[in-house]
Regions:
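Conserved ATP-binding/catalytic segment of the ANL
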Residues: 1-65
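Adenylate-forming
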Residues: 7-12, 29-30, 52-81, 111-131, ...
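Generic, well-ordered alpha-helical scaffold segments in large soluble proteins
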Residues: 10, 29, 44, 79, ...
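C-terminal boundary motif of the adenylate-forming
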Residues: 40-44, 83-110, 145-148
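Short Gly/Ser/Thr- and Asp/Glu-enriched loop/turn motifs at secondary-structure junctions
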Residues: 58, 94-99, 154-156
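Conserved C-terminal "lid"/linker of ANL adenylate-forming enzymes
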Residues: 63, 88-90, 138, 143-197
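Generic structural signal for hydrophobic residues
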Residues: 76, 133, 137-141
Length: 197
């Protein structure tokens, strides 16, 4: 929440053209507490040792696991991107399961190098489905998570690999390359379900 006299009254809606979506956002994103107007940013922050507020995540990207721990999906994704095999990643978790999983768009050059070192041939899709490749990349991703200081429940336990890049054209990301989680989950539903089997 941020509040004070500089917080606006809400999103502008013209009286002659009411917008129900904006009206709903004005109700859900703005509130008055003890006479002070607040805006619900949706950000999750933490104070640093020197008292500065640091934005660390978005509330909508926090997921509660079965045991009650919260996983910050974008934090996990940022750590996974440090793995040389990972081009893009989407972490997934829900309250029905005790661990997170991830869908990874592989980097082609490191993938081919890994395949050659293991004497595995095939096109990119075949490599992404190869059990040895999946295990090697999963292990590398888990090592990146340890190096990124993720705790055990934050580290995805299983991984689904894809060679197809996520672009605005295939509607997996926005024009600003932010993940469209619902679209990715829908496209990889069978792989995510298999990861929880």
């Amino acid at each position: 929440l941020i509040g004070g006299p500089v917080v606006c009254q809400g999103y502008y809606t013209a009286s002659h053209m009411p917008d129900p979506e904006l009206a709903a956002k004005n109700t859900s994103e703005f509130s008055v507490i003890d006479g002070v107007r607040y805006f619900h940013t949706g950000d999750v922050g933490q104070f640093t040792a020197d008292g500065q507020l640091m934005i660390i995540d978005r509330k909508k990207d926090l997921v509660k696991l079965q045991q009650g721990e919260y996983v910050a999906l974008s934090k996990v994704e940022n750590v996974l991107k440090q793995c040389p095999y990972v081009g893009m990643a989407m972490a997934y978790a829900d309250s029905k399961h005790s661990y997170a999983v991830a869908v990874v768009v592989v980097n082609e050059a490191p993938l081919k190098k890994l395949a050659a070192s293991k004497n595995i041939s095939g096109d990119l899709d075949q490599l992404c489905a190869n059990a040895t490749i999946v295990k090697e990349i999963s292990d590398a991703c888990k090592a990146a998570c340890r190096a990124g200081k993720l705790v055990g429940f934050e580290t995805p336990a299983k991984y689904a690999l894809t060679a197809e890049p996520w672009t605005p054209d295939n509607d997996m990301v926005t024009a600003a390359f932010k993940l469209k989680r619902q679209n990715i989950v829908a496209a990889f539903k069978s792989q995510i379900t298999a990861a929880y089997a």
